[in-house]
Amino acid sequence: MSNFNTDVNSFLNLENFSHKKFLIFGEEPALIVKAKNHALADEDLRMVEKVYLDMEERDFEENFNQAILSNSLFNEKKVIFIRLKKNRLNKDLIASFKLISEANTESLILIETQSISKKIILKDILPIFKSN
């Protein structure tokens, strides 16, 4: 993930993007929905397997690894939706972000958080993804 865009309007104006991992954050539900729809615009949602994970669950690492490694019997592609509701980071969440960042997968990964501030995202989370 070499090019990071934190402006939703710039992202929504993009016609093509090559990234497979998206961090969607903010407190405006309508913009979150628009950003998700834009990231999924090129996908036929009837033909993808959807996996929903909660980053705060104790077995997140195991579930995430299973999601990216398992093959679907019926679908070619997989979209992994990851939700984070906490408003602050801890070492387990940072480890989870590192796990996601280091994952080498063709699956589309959408991480959604509404409670973590932009300051924390810019300072603590984006550098994790920039290093990979």
Where are these regions (language model features)?
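Non-catalytic interfacial helical region
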Residues: M1-N9, P29-N132
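Phosphate-binding P-loop
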Residues: N13-S18
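Short hydrophobic/aromatic beta-strand immediately N-terminal to the Walker A/P-loop
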Residues: K21-F25, F81
